[in-house]
UniProtKB/Swiss-Prot annotation:
Entry keyword set: ATP-binding, Chaperone, Nucleotide-binding
SUPFAM superfamilies referenced in this protein's UniProt entry, alphabetically: GroEL apical domain-like (SSF52029), GroEL equatorial domain-like (SSF48592), GroEL-intermediate domain like (SSF54849)
The keyword NADP is assigned to this record: no
Family, per entry: Belongs to the TCP-1 chaperonin family.
Protein name as catalogued: Thermosome subunit beta
Length: 546
C-alpha cells in the first residue's frame, strides 16, 4: 500500500510483503551471512563435516561447500545467490567453494558496517568493484609459472585439495590417481593443454577400502555379458560399437500380415532369423570379437553371437559409448551393415569381473586412451561418496594447473597478500571509496582467521603473527594449521591453481555487489495449500531467516 496526497492506494495484492531501503538490505545481508556461517566451520584441513538428512531420511556427510549448499533446501532469494556462488566456483575452478562463500559473507558483513555509518551503497559497490579488479591483477603478479609436465607439483596441488576431506588418510595415493587421470586425457592444442573432464569416468562400488580405488586406462561399465555362453574374457579385443538394436526392426506404419497357412508362418519366422543372422555374420566378418550395443539384442542374435565366441553387452549408456570410442579408437556405427574393419577399436583385454558381488565389464590396455575410469572403493556408501567428491576436486585442481600453468601458495597466503596490498591501494584511490576498499581488504582476512579458528588456534594471535611474517618474508607465507605457526606454504607443498582464488574473489565480490544493489524486496504471498494438506495463507518472507 502506498500513499498519495494523504490517500492510501492499494497497488499490490493482499498478503504481499514489502521491505524497503535499509530493511531490505539488512534482511538480504543477514540471509547471505547465515549461509556463509553455515559452511565456515568446514574450511581448511582441520574443518569439520556436516551431516545433512533430507525429508526421505537419506544422509549426506561432507565438508564440501558446494555439496552442503546443494543438499540444503534454501528458500530465501539472497541466500540462493550464495548457493550460486558455490556452484559457479565448483564449475569454474573445482575447488575453493567454501572460500568463495565465506569471503562473500564477510564482504557483506563489512558492507553492513559501512551502511551503518551512512555510506551510500553505490559508493560501497564502486569501492568493492575497484578492489576486486585490483585483486585479480595482484594474483596474476604473485602467481608462479610451473612446468605442467612436473608431476610433483601437480601431485602437491591434488594433495592440498584432498587434505581435510574424509579421504585424507590415503591422500598421496588418491593424488597420484588424479594426476595420472588428467595427464592421460589431456590433449595438446597449440602450445597449451586442454582437459575435458567428461573423459574421466567415476564408477563407485561399496566394499574393500579406499586403498582399493584404482585407475583403469580404459573404461569400466556397470553391465554384464548378455548370454551365459559368451566368453567372459577376451584378449586382443577387436571392439565394435553399435548404436542400433540387434533386433528385427518394426515398421513405421501399422501394417498387418494375414497368415493363412503354416508354411507362410514358417517362412515369416525363417526370414526374421535370416535378418538377425545376417547382422551377426556381418559383425563376425569384419573381425569383431567384442560388441557393445546401445540398445537391445534379440535372444536369437545373442545365441549366434555366443556360438561365434563374440562377447556382447547391451543397453550401454550413450556417455559410456562415447568414452569407449575415445579409449579404444572405435567409431560408433548406426547401421550394422555399414560396419567395416576400420570402425573397430582395440584393447588388450575386455573382461567381466565381479566387484562387490556385482558383474562389471573392464576394457583395459587401450593404446594411449583419451578416456579413463576411476573405480572408487570404500567401506560404506558415505565413504565412497566423499572419496568421489575429494577426487573430483583433485582432478579439477590438476586440470586447472595443466591448462593455466600457474599456481599460488595456499593456506591463506594469497588472501593475506591481497589484504596488505589492497590497504595500500585504498590510500591511492582516496575519497569515500577508500573506506570500501579497506573494508574489502579487511574482509579477506577472514580466510586465514577461519583456518586458525577451525584448527583450534587463537585466531587473533595467529593472524597477527602471520601478517608480521608475511610482510617480512613475502607473499608465500600462510597459516600452517598443523604446526600452529606461520610458514612458507610453497616450501611445504601447500599450493593451489591461481584460478581458485581468482574465481573465488570474482564470484564473492559479484554476489556481494548484487545483494547491495537491492533496496526493495516485494514478496508475493505463498499459494494456499489445499485444506487437508496443512496450513494455507501467506508465509512471512522474513521467517525464512529464522
Amino acid at each position: 500500500m502506498a500513499q498519495l496526497a494523504g490517500q492510501p492506494v492499494v497497488i499490490l495484492p493482499e498478503g504481499t510483503q514489502r521491505y524497503v531501503g535499509r530493511d531490505a538490505q539488512r534482511l538480504n545481508i543477514l540471509a547471505a551471512r547465515i549461509i556463509a556461517e553455515t559452511v565456515r566451520t568446514t574450511l581448511g584441513p582441520k574443518g569439520m563435516d556436516k551431516m545433512l538428512v533430507d525429508s526421505l531420511g537419506d544422509i549426506v556427510i561432507t565438508n564440501d561447500g558446494a555439496t552442503i549448499l546443494d543438499e540444503m533446501d534454501i528458500q530465501h532469494p539472497a541466500a540462493k545467490m550464495m548457493v550460486e556462488v558455490a556452484k559457479t566456483q565448483d564449475k569454474e575452478a573445482g575447488d575453493g567453494t567454501t572460500t568463495a562463500v565465506v569471503i562473500a559473507g564477510e564482504l557483506l558483513r563489512k558492507a553492513e558496517e559501512l551502511l551503518d555509518q551512512n555510506i551510500h551503497p553505490s559508493i560501497i559497490i564502486k569501492g568493492y568493484a575497484l578492489a576486486a579488479e585490483k585483486a585479480q591483477e595482484i594474483l596474476d603478479e604473485i602467481a608462479k609459472d610451473v612446468d605442467v609436465e612436473d608431476r610433483e607439483i601437480l601431485k602437491k596441488a591434488a594433495v592440498t585439495s584432498i587434505t581435510g576431506k574424509a579421504a585424507e588418510e590415503e591422500r598421496e595415493y588418491l593424488a597420484e590417481i588424479a594426476v595420472e587421470a588428467v595427464k592421460q586425457v589431456a590433449e595438446k592444442v597449440g602450445e597449451t593443454y586442454k582437459v575435458d573432464l567428461d573423459n574421466i569416468k567415476f564408477e563407485k562400488k561399496e566394499g574393500g577400502s579406499v586403498k582399493d580405488t584404482q585407475l583403469i586406462k580404459g573404461v569400466v561399465i556397470d553391465k554384464e555379458v548378455v548370454h551365459p555362453g559368451m566368453p567372459k574374457r577376451v584378449e586382443g579385443a577387436k571392439i565394435a560399437l553399435i548404436n542400433e538394436a540387434l533386433e528385427v526392426k518394426e515398421t513405421e506404419t501399422d501394417a498387418e500380415i494375414r497368415i493363412t497357412s503354416p508354411e507362410q508362418l514358417q517362412a515369416f519366422l525363417e526370414q526374421e532369423e535370416k535378418m538377425l543372422r545376417e547382422m551377426v555374420d556381418k559383425i563376425k566378418e569384419v573381425g569383431a570379437n567384442v560388441v557393445f550395443v546401445q540398445k537391445g539384442i534379440d535372444d536369437l542374435a545373442q545365441h549366434y553371437l555366443a556360438k561365434y565366441g563374440i562377447m556382447a553387452v547391451r543397453r550401454v549408456k550413450k556417455s559410456d559409448m562415447e568414452k569407449l570410442a575415445k579409449a579404444t579408437g572405435a567409431k560408433i556405427v548406426t547401421n550394422v551393415r555399414d560396419l567395416t574393419p576400420e570402425d573397430l577399436g582395440e584393447a588388450e583385454l575386455v573382461e567381466q569381473r565381479k566387484v562387490a558381488g556385482e558383474n562389471m565389464i573392464f576394457v583395459e590396455g587401450c593404446k594411449n586412451p583419451k578416456a579413463v575410469t576411476i573405480l572408487i572403493r570404500g567401506g560404506t556408501e558415505h565413504v565412497v561418496d566423499e572419496v568421489e567428491r575429494a577426487l573430483e576436486d583433485a582432478v579439477k585442481v590438476v586440470k586447472d594447473i595443466v591448462e593455466d600453468g600457474k599456481i599460488v601458495a595456499a593456506g591463506g597466503a594469497p588472501e593475506i597478500e591481497l589484504s596488505i596490498r589492497l590497504d595500500e591501494y585504498a590510500k591511492e584511490v582516496g575519497g569515500k571509496e577508500q573506506l570500501a576498499i579497506e573494508a574489502f581488504a579487511e574482509a579477506l582476512k577472514v580466510i586465514p582467521r577461519t583456518l586458525a579458528e577451525n584448527a583450534g588456534l587463537d585466531p587473533i594471535e595467529t593472524l597477527v603473527k602471520v601478517i608480521a611474517a608475511h610482510k617480512e618474508k613475502g607473499p608465500t607465507i600462510g597459516v600452517d594449521v598443523f604446526e600452529g605457526e606461520p610458514a612458507d606454504m610453497l616450501e611445504r607443498g601447500v599450493i593451489a591453481p591461481v584460478r581458485v582464488p581468482k574465481q573465488a574473489i570474482k564470484s564473492a565480490s559479484e554476489a556481494a555487489i548484487m545483494i547491495l544493489r537491492i533496496d526493495d524486496v516485494i514478496a508475493a504471498s505463498k499459494l494456499e495449500k489445499d485444506k487437508e494438506g496443512g496450513k494455507g495463507g501467506s508465509e512471512d518472507f522474513g521467517s525464512d531467516l529464522d
